[in-house]
């Protein structure tokens, strides 16, 4: 409440203001001057407003009998979770590695059976690629995949509509399949990094396994939390 100078105190004290709770004052006012009180929920501690630093590491085209295990060991050292988009024809040969991926707390995604360019296939062929891979994944790990990635990132709205999974592409391509250089892997991530990034790598190249510790170290020092694709997708759609 604001009082002009001299109203309730000597004039030399100037204007006087008194803080009064609206919940106390409101009932004292005439009805036409009362204000509608709106209850506001208190902030929830730890509530994510979308600005938290997070990153999703993804690995395509495995599992591989040597490289995937090295990748898993590196992820363990940083308590980092990742998503592995697996080819059905490799899951069939290495089911125990696919199961190890799941048992270490990572996400398993479907990446088709034979890595075709999906827009060149018929709908029946596309669903066969998905379903045969899904059967191999279920046989290996005892549960379905949770996400899908089209080979080469090549897809259409029509294809996405028939795949019964969330379709995840990427926002950072490390080109690890091309340069096969551990140092370039780290630099590629540094050059392109942004919040809520989905990083594409491949757990079939030794150079990727060799460079992964550097990537993890950089991201950890920058304060990023390592999450799965399913965890990050609400923030990138």
Predicted regions, residues:
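Hydrophobic membrane-insertion alpha-helices, especially the h-region
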Residues: 1-4
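N-terminal "first-domain core" detector
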Residues: 9-12
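Active-site beta->alpha N-cap acidic-glycine motif
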Residues: 17, 22-121, 125-132, 136, ...
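Catalytic domains of cell-wall/extracellular-matrix polysaccharide-remodeling enzymes
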Residues: 70, 92-93, 116-237
